[in-house]
Amino acid sequence: MVKLIHTLADHGDDVSCCAFSSTLLATCSLDKTIRLYSLSDFAELPHSPLKFHTYAVHCCSFSPSGHVLASCSTDGTTVLWSAHSGHTLTVLEQPGGSPVRVCCFSPDSTYLASGAADGSVVLWNAHSYKLYRCGSVKDSSLVACAFSPDGGLLVTGSSGGDLTVWDDRMRCLHSEKAHDLGITCCSFSSQPLSGGEHGLQLYRLASCGQDCEIKLWVVSFTRVLGFELKYRSTLSGHCAPVLACAFSHDGQMLASGSVDKSVIIYDIGTQSVLHTLTQHTRYVTTCAFAPNTLLLATGSMDKTVNIWQFDLETPCQAGSVSDQLKHFIEDWSEEDVSKWLRAQGLEDLVDIFRTNNIDGKELLHLTKESLAGDMKIESLGLRSKVLRSIDELRTRMESLSSGIPDEFICPITRELMKDPVIASDGYSYEREAMESWIHKKKRTSPMTNLALPSLVLTPNRTLKMAINRWLETHQK
């Protein structure tokens, strides 16, 4: 389903970053160079390597058109190159001359962002090469940055562990502690969850860090409710700091690279591990998906870049996901269940589940009676959390088996929504179910159990349109 088709071994030091355009692959290294390869045969271009930087090159990024390549370095500069000739277009000097750790283009190629070790983040006009706006974070280095698919937001990650969200004028909208030991990378899915209609924008964001975790977030923005960054889930699998993460172009897969020398590929729909790749012999520092083909590049401190190819029939395509999830859970070993418990924050129950030989099949058949009576779990809170987590697994299996996208199902009724509304917790619900919840229950979020900031329910017209389109397609 995924196979190693080529290994590039031209760099003389650690590979720090790799990036695709529609026709080229760029790699950069601590050896001060950037190398360019053709995707047709992975031959290095005649004008490669690109040489200008006087110290290690940390990041490289293509403009959306693929015509311009940006690279940044410890030497305090971000260089723009012609990807097709190798000529230097301009050299952008970071204010203060601090080492530049990361750079990326906005989706419309208007801006280039560069983040530095002194915490500064600069928005450059990518056409005039002039400094447009500046921002900074306190007491941390900027180590990650990503533009939202519409270009309206820039998210940066710091060595202190904060995700910071900026608007297109570099005004700080939000800052949140995301990873206790520091962030290493962040990446937006290019496919919006919904958006464009009535001012609603919903995007998926991934972040990873020194805490060995990958976290998934939903970034939402409406003119009425403003901006929100909502934590959704944590992907487990790595046993050491995670240094890189990247979404596939269709948003259905996420790849990550780690200090544990492995690359893990996740199915975003089921949040299950699809593949674990262990060919690198040292830390995996970077990973990137190609925009138009099923290719993945991974780079490492072993000085190599591996190119992987996926079969056309990937597990993320419709018709196979439900079967995969069903087999994935029912075939879980006792150790898989232990990993799942830890991912749910239930590590205190690992020994109890092992003692009772709970594997995937047994997990799906647990009840409140068996948890209390047979397994002697006395805490009502723990029993409730276990049952809720198991219900989520069952529900995901059922919704996928029925073919209904999970985001179309009301979290309260677990039925297809007809009149979806956005509550102040950022989640969407069926209007009637949410109104009943508010009137009969405590005024807390059904998803987080936290107090609702407001009881206002905003029609989610974009989601309603998506549901109607899905119904029209699937009821023919």
From Swiss-Prot:
What residue stretches are annotated with the SAM domain? Answer: 332-396
The molecular function terms of the Gene Ontology recorded here are: ubiquitin-protein transferase activity
GO terms (BP aspect): protein ubiquitination
User: Would I find Transcription regulation among this entry's keywords?
Assistant: no
Q: Name one Pfam family in it.
A: U-box
* Lineage summary: Eukaryota, Metazoa, Chordata, Craniata, Vertebrata
Q: List residue spans for each WD repeat.
A: 10-47, 52-91, 95-134, 137-176, 178-228, 237-276, 279-318
Q: Does the keyword Plastid apply?
A: no
Q: Source organism's superkingdom?
A: Eukaryota
Give the modified residues of type Phosphothreonine.
Answer: 458
Gene3D superfamilies according to UniProt: Transcription Factor, Ets-1, YVTN repeat-like/Quinoprotein amine dehydrogenase, Zinc/RING finger domain, C3HC4 (zinc finger)
**SUPFAM superfamilies listed in its UniProt record:** RING/U-box, SAM/Pointed domain, WD40 repeat-like
Record domain U-box: where: 403-476
Cite the InterPro entries for this sequence.
G-protein_beta_WD-40_rep, SAM, SAM/pointed_sf, Ubox_domain, WD-SAM-U-box, WD40/YVTN_repeat-like_dom_sf, WD40_repeat_dom_sf, WD40_rpt
The record's keywords, sorted A to Z, are:
Phosphoprotein, Repeat, WD repeat
| Protein name stated in the entry | WD repeat, SAM and U-box domain-containing protein 1
